[in-house]
């Protein structure tokens, strides 16, 4: 973004100098007014836009100059009122930034012209305050600050927009009335509070954990804070001075509230200045002052001399090139306009007004034979053009350098004035310290005199005591005098202590004065350096003047050479006339050649047109023959041995639909441009080939379908072939080609597609485009189900340890541990299956995407989906069964059956994954090892369940010691009956299980994706079930 330019400088304001260069009067003509308004409108719209970047300084400066130009802000508000500030937070934020700049650096009448919109700004602030995100809250606080600023400057018109005032002007603003100073301090506190709120809100809205100041979004929010920093530095300085003035007039208790509020704002401002100085964005744009470590002590009047006004410095060298005023460049171009026009007129007088109308331009007359004079003229012309450009550039650069040096001189003068001001302030402080030093010396002399008089009095008292010891009255008088002298001695001693403390303070102030003198000396050294730089700049300016004079001499030399060339021009006129006669003869010859060429082109075009018709007719007849052959094969008995695929038929239909769209497009292109016939011929040939394949594939597919759908499909293919022949016949002539319509062909294709989709197996209900995503989702769901099962087993084990003891706890730990091992083995199996599937897809898809591979092999894909669902479902059911067994509510047999069912599901997943895998694949070997691990884990679950069941039954064995022989015989018979019933039920359940498995594999044979020759039978999956089953 653009950097802040010198219009915001705190030390000096260059706007009056810019305005003096412009010299625009108050009364503008209509054309000038229209141009001014157009320029201002463009600048305002460029400065206030919806892009999240900082406002460009050159646009903001143009707006500021416009206010000084028209002595107000009417044009600015007329443009802003057309912007949707209430509906776009970014526009409102940038408007606040630009308006803040105008209030600071614009014409004083900007405030008067803006007061009428104060209520609108308040309403807009309340509206944006309802938004807590984005720029809404920032806009609300910024608008509140601008309204407070307008009210403050309205109440205190003595304060300029940039808040730069001297101490005398600050005293005049309060009119030497303590009540006015008190109220002015309160208003400054409110003003500074609004500035700090905006400062804090902007920082809170930024993510300070990263380099936010180097992003355009961060710079957009940070850019207005430069104006805030300038305002805060002045407000803080004036607040300190006013508080010292109030403390000199009012009691300290009365100003306690002022001191508390100042302490709060001092802490905030110091923290914000510290944080701002660390940002990279501010380091290259502004030098932020640092506040003292401790706040001023207003209870000590001498602390005012320790206060240093914070000065914000904006380096001039950070101004970007695009921030230079456009007006200066225009003025620079106007300075050389007359000289350039004079040179162009002279050049036109010598060589003519333009190259195209020059009768002596030999390049157009004869581009082959050039004599030495022609080359000389061209070379001199190029050299003159180059030197002219160099001269113009040198003039522009010299003028730009002069303007830059003038600006640098102005900046150095401003810095010199500031240094002089600081020097005068240091001299005033020095004079104040000298006065205090003289006062302390006088007090010290008085103290020494009192001490000498005290010594004399004591001596006299001792003499009187010896002389008049016998006189009691005189003695009493002397005692009284002695007591008085003692009191005086105490007072003098106290004065001596005060004098000593003052002497210590004097020494400290002397040291501070010496430091102040040292700083002043350093500032004088800096001033000398600046003067040296100024002298160097002036020397460079003199060198540029000398270079300019040298360039003028070179220009005179070239004008002399041009005059000599002008003399040679007359001698070349004769040669030009001869060349003109030769050119006329060549033109006649060219006309006769063009006539012959036109006749040859017409005959060639006719031959090409006839060849295109012949080629189109031949391709069309060949296509008709191919389709007729396909139609004749519908009744051929040779197709009985062929087995078609519905998937293949649907893919052929899709290809034909795409070919029809391309054929329509190519036909339109051929009608628009008959020369481009290659694409049309290719589309006709491709349509005939695909149509024949579709008809033959439809007939072959109907052989495996039921009779009624087969007849419908055959008739639909036959009708499609007839419609295709009719369409090809309409392509015979260009007149009939325009009326050719493929709607009937599309209807026939839709009929074939509908019949084909009805013949698809029930397992293909899912869209083929979604199969790839569904495989990934099901595998992820299986992994998640296994993880959830493992977590739940751990929770069940924790509950069992907390509530069970003895044999039951041992059995539960063994069973749940084996279940956890089984879950881990299944997890390894699922990961190996994913790796193998990825390898299969990568090796088999070619240039197609994975989703297209899954869609192409839909049956195999749905087999994977079914196997994954079965594994996840089995893991959930086994965890439920284990939970019931641990609680004593379930059966051990249910847990064994669930573990075997998981083994069967994993075997199904292995079988589905092995269908398309290479036998030598490393991932296949890992999958088989994982499958064996699952079998072992399943056997461990069954073994731990049987062992636990045995232990539980041993503990629950019946006690027959108290039973009689009859009772034991009775229970024996009951047990035999129960055994027979259970054996009968077992036989029936085994038969039912066999029927269920048979029906399951009949229904899932197609849906589980095993292709022909590799379909898994029930025996195949059964062999993969562990031996323990």
Curated annotation (Swiss-Prot):
Primary location group: cytoplasm
InterPro entries: ANTH_dom, ENTH, ENTH_VHS, HIP1_clath-bd, I/LWEQ_dom_sf, ILWEQ_dom, Sla2_fam
Keywords, comma-separated and alphabetical: Actin-binding, Activator, Apoptosis, Coiled coil, Cytoplasm, Cytoplasmic vesicle, Differentiation, Endocytosis, Membrane, Neurodegeneration, Nucleus, Phosphoprotein, Transcription, Transcription regulation
Pfam families: ANTH (PF07651), HIP1_clath_bdg (PF16515), I_LWEQ (PF01608)
Gene3D superfamilies documented for this protein: 1.20.5.1700, 1.25.40.90, 6.10.250.920, I/LWEQ domain
Domains (record comment): The pseudo DED region (pDED) mediates the interaction with IFT57. Binds F-actin via the talin-like I/LWEQ domain.
Subunit structure: Homodimer. Binds actin. Binds HTT (via N-terminus). This interaction is restricted to the brain. Binds to IFT57. In normal conditions, it poorly interacts with IFT57, HIP1 being strongly associated with HTT. However, in mutant HTT proteins with a long poly-Gln region, interaction between HTT and HIP1 is inhibited, promoting the interaction between HIP1 and IFT57. Interacts with CLTB (via N-terminus). Interacts (via coiled coil domain) with AR. Interacts with AP2A1, AP2A2, CLTC and HIP1R. Interacts with GRIA1, GRIN2A and GRIN2B.
Function: Plays a role in clathrin-mediated endocytosis and trafficking. Involved in regulating AMPA receptor trafficking in the central nervous system in an NMDA-dependent manner. Regulates presynaptic nerve terminal activity. Enhances androgen receptor (AR)-mediated transcription. May act as a proapoptotic protein that induces cell death by acting through the intrinsic apoptosis pathway. Binds 3-phosphoinositides (via ENTH domain). May act through the ENTH domain to promote cell survival by stabilizing receptor tyrosine kinases following ligand-induced endocytosis.
Protein name (Swiss-Prot/TrEMBL): Huntingtin-interacting protein 1
Lineage: Eukaryota, Metazoa, Chordata, Craniata, Vertebrata
């Amino acid at each position: 973004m653009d950097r802040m330019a010198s219009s915001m400088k705190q030390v000096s304001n260059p706007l009056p100098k810019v305005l003096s260069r412009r010299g625009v009067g108050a009364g503008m003509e209509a054309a000038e007014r229209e141009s001014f308004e157009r320029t201002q409108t463009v600048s305002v719209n460029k400065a206030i836009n919806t892009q999240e970047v900082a406002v460009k300084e050159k646009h903001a400066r143009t707006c500021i100059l416009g206010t000084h130009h028209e002595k107000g802000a009417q044009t600015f508000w007329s443009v802003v009122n057309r912007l949707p500030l209430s509906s776009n937070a970014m526009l409102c934020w940038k408007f606040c930034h630009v308006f803040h700049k105008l209030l600071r650096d614009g014409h004083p009448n900007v405030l008067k012209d803006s007061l009428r919109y104060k209520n609108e700004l308040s309403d807009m602030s309340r509206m944006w305050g309802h938004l807590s995100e984005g720029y809404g809250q920032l806009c609300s606080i910024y608008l509140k600050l601008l309204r407070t600023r307008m009210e403050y400057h309205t109440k205190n018109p003595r304060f300029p927009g940039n808040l730069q005032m001297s101490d005398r002007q600050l005293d005049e603003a309060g009119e030497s009335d303590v009540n006015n100073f008190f109220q002015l301090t309160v208003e400054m506190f409110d003003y500074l509070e609004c500035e700090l709120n905006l400062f804090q809100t902007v920082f809170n809205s930024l993510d300070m954990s990263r380099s936010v100041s180097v992003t355009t979004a961060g710079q957009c929010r940070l850019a207005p804070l430069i104006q805030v920093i300038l305002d805060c530095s002045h407000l803080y300085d004036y607040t300190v001075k006013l508080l010292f003035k109030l403390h000199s007039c009012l009691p300290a208790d009365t100003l306690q509230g002022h001191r508390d509020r100042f302490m709060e704002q001092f802490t905030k401002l110091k923290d914000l200045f510290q944080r701002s100085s660390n940002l990279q964005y501010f380091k290259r744009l502004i030098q932020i002052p640092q506040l003292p470590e401790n706040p001023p002590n207003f209870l000590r009047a001498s602390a005012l001399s320790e206060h240093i006004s914070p000065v914000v410095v904006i380096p001039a060298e950070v101004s970007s090139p695009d921030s230079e005023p456009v007006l200066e460049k225009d003025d620079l171009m106007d300075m050389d306009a007359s000289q350039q026009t004079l040179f162009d007129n002279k050049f036109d007088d010598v060589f003519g007004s333009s190259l195209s109308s020059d009768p002596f331009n030999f390049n157009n007359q004869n581009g082959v034979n050039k004599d030495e004079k022609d080359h000389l003229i061209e070379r001199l012309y190029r050299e003159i053009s180059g030197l002219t450009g160099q001269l113009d550039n040198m003039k522009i650069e010299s003028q730009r350098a002069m303007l830059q040096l003038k600006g640098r001189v102005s900046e150095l003068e401003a810095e010199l004035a500031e240094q002089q001001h600081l020097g005068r302030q240091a001299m005033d402080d020095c004079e104040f310290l000298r006065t205090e030093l003289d006062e302390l010396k006088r007090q010290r002399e008085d103290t020494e005199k009192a001490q000498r008089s005290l010594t004399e009095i004591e001596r006299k008292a001792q003499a009187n005591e010896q002389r008049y010891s016998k006189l009691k009255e005189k003695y009493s008088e002397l005692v009284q005098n002695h007591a008085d002298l003692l009191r005086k001695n105490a007072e003098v001693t106290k004065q001596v202590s005060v004098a000593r403390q003052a002497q210590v303070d004097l020494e400290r102030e002397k040291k501070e004065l010496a430091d102040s003198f040292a700083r002043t000396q350093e500032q004088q050294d800096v001033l000398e350096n600046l003067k040296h730089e100024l002298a160097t700049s002036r020397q460079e300016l003199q060198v540029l003047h000398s270079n300019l004079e040298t360039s003028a001499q070179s220009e005179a030399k070239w004008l002399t050479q041009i005059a000599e060339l002008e003399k040679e021009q007359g001698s070349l006129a004769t040669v030009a006339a001869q060349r003109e006669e030769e050119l006329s003869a060549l033109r006649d010859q060219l006309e006769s050649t063009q006539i012959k060429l036109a006749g040859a082109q017409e005959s060639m075009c006719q031959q090409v047109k006839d060849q295109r018709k012949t080629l189109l007719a031949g391709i069309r007849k060949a296509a008709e023959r191919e389709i007729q052959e396909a139609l004749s094969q519908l009744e051929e008995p040779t197709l009985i041995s062929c087995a078609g695929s519905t998937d293949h038929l649907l893919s052929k239909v899709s290809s034909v639909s795409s070919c029809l769209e391309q054929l329509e497009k190519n036909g339109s292109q051929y009608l628009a441009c008959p020369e481009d016939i290659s694409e049309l011929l290719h589309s006709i040939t491709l349509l005939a080939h695909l149509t024949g394949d579709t008809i033959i594939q439809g007939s072959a597919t109907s052989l495996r379908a039921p009779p009624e759908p087969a007849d419908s499909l055959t008739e639909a293919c036959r009708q499609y072939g007839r419609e295709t022949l009719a369409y090809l016949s309409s392509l015979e002539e260009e007149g009939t080609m325009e009326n050719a319509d493929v709607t009937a062909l599309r209807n026939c294709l839709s009929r074939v597609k509908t019949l084909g989709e009805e013949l698809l197996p029930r397992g293909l209900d899912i869209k083929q485009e979604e199969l790839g995503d569904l495989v990934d989702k099901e595998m992820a769901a299986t992994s998640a189900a296994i993880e959830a099962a493992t977590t739940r087993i751990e929770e069940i084990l924790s509950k069992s340890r907390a509530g069970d003891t003895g044999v039951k706890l041992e059995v539960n730990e063994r069973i749940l541990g084996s279940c956890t091992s089984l879950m881990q083995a299944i997890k390894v199996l699922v990961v190996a299956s994913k790796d193998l599937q990825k390898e299969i897809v990568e090796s088999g898809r070619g240039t197609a995407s994975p989703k297209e591979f899954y869609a192409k092999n839909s049956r195999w894909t749905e087999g994977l989906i079914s196997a994954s669902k079965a594994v996840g479902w089995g893991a959930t059911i086994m965890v439920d069964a284990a939970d019931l067994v641990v609680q004593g509510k379930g059966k051990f047999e249910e847990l064994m059956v669930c573990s075997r069912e998981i083994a069967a599901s994993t075997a199904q997943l292995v079988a589905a994954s092995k269908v398309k895998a290479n036998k030598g694949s490393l991932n296949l070997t890992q999958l088989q090892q994982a499958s064996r691990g699952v079998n072992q884990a399943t056997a461990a679950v069954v073994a731990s369940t049987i062992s636990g069941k045995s232990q539980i039954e041993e503990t629950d064995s019946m006690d027959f010691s108290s039973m009689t022989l009859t009772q034991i015989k009775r229970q024996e018979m009951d047990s035999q009956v129960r055994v027979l019933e259970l054996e009968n039920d077992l036989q029936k359940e085994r038969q039912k299980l066999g029927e269920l498995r048979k029906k399951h594999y009949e229904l899932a044979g197609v849906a589980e994706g095993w292709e022909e020759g590799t379909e898994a039978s029930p025996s195949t999956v059964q062999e993969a079930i562990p031996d323990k089953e």
